[in-house]
Amino acid sequence: MEVNILAFIATTLFVLVPTAFLLIIYVKTVSQSD
């Protein structure tokens, strides 16, 4: 099976970007709650 590097990168970014965004919001919310 050939590994499509571009598809792999696109999928990784598609997962990591929203995850990082939500993580930042979570951290800010916890910091403000304290």
Curated annotation (Swiss-Prot):
Entry keyword annotation includes Thylakoid: yes
Transmembrane segments: 5-25
Compartments (UniProt record): Plastid, Chloroplast thylakoid membrane
Primary location group: plastid
Membrane topology: Single-pass membrane protein
GO BP: photosynthesis, light reaction
GO cellular component entries: chloroplast thylakoid membrane; photosystem II
Keywords, comma-separated and alphabetical: Chloroplast, Membrane, Photosynthesis, Photosystem II, Plastid, Reaction center, Thylakoid, Transmembrane, Transmembrane helix
Subunit structure: PSII is composed of 1 copy each of membrane proteins PsbA, PsbB, PsbC, PsbD, PsbE, PsbF, PsbH, PsbI, PsbJ, PsbK, PsbL, PsbM, PsbT, PsbX, PsbY, PsbZ, Psb30/Ycf12, at least 3 peripheral proteins of the oxygen-evolving complex and a large number of cofactors. It forms dimeric complexes.
Family: Belongs to the PsbM family.
Reported function: One of the components of the core complex of photosystem II (PSII). PSII is a light-driven water:plastoquinone oxidoreductase that uses light energy to abstract electrons from H(2)O, generating O(2) and a proton gradient subsequently used for ATP formation. It consists of a core antenna complex that captures photons, and an electron transfer chain that converts photonic excitation into a charge separation. This subunit is found at the monomer-monomer interface.
Name of the protein: Photosystem II reaction center protein M
Native source species: Citrus sinensis (Sweet orange)
Recorded name of the encoding gene: psbM
